[in-house]
Amino acid sequence: NQAYADMSMQSTRHRDMFKISEKIDMSEKLVYSFPMATYSPDIPYNELPPLPPAEVVETVPVLKAIIDAKEKLAELRTACQLIPNPEIITSTIPLREARASSEIENIVTTNDELFRAAWHVDAEPSPATKEALRYNSALHAGLSSLSQRPLSEKTAKIVCSTLLDTPAEVRSLPGTFIGNPVTQQRLYIPPEGKEIIEGHLAAWEDYIYSNHDVDSLVKMALLHYQFEAIHPFYDGNGRTGRILNVLHLIQEELLELPVLYLSGYIVGNK
């Protein structure tokens, strides 16, 4: 959350509401026109700049990290191909990811509770366990969607709807903020207004398939940042974003199976 503030304070404060002025067809690409972005933690960041960022993101340290990350992903992909029965890991690692990703949102269950519920050992799982199980269902709903259509805003809605067990709606009411819920101190207020948020989501989706010649892992990070900054839904944005990361890696053929346990690292390195 603080990263949103730190990366945005370089622009000057401006209270004019942003509007998408037009879509321009340039070389068969949709280009969204936005005014100069400005930021204040006290007002909705309706002027959130679309991707790509103006700053250079593929720095030497980033590129070195990408080489290492891709080597590890290739090893994981090969290991999955060599396992005679991949279901051994596809039935366990996504559940561990579901538990850890839910824990990031303070939805806490144990591996034992989760596996017992997944295998129908317990008649009535706890509410937290049910939520973690829905994360697993949302991941598989996203995979199913990916087999029918490319990654998109629609994918995000399918994933979030499965997570919440109710249709996910783009926020139309004000009041969402990132910060301290007790003191009400705000670090970041995401864009507000359904049309404004939908405009940001449309630009986010366009960037997925734009040719900006950035590495697929860098693109994943940028897309994740932008999705969380848009914060399009009333609930489930963080978990939805983490599932979209895995789906992006599969779409880019850096993974074959959803067996990347990223949330466990996040929980262990807060």
Question: At which residue positions do the language-model features occur?
Answer:
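FIC/Doc superfamily catalytic core
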Residues: N1-K270
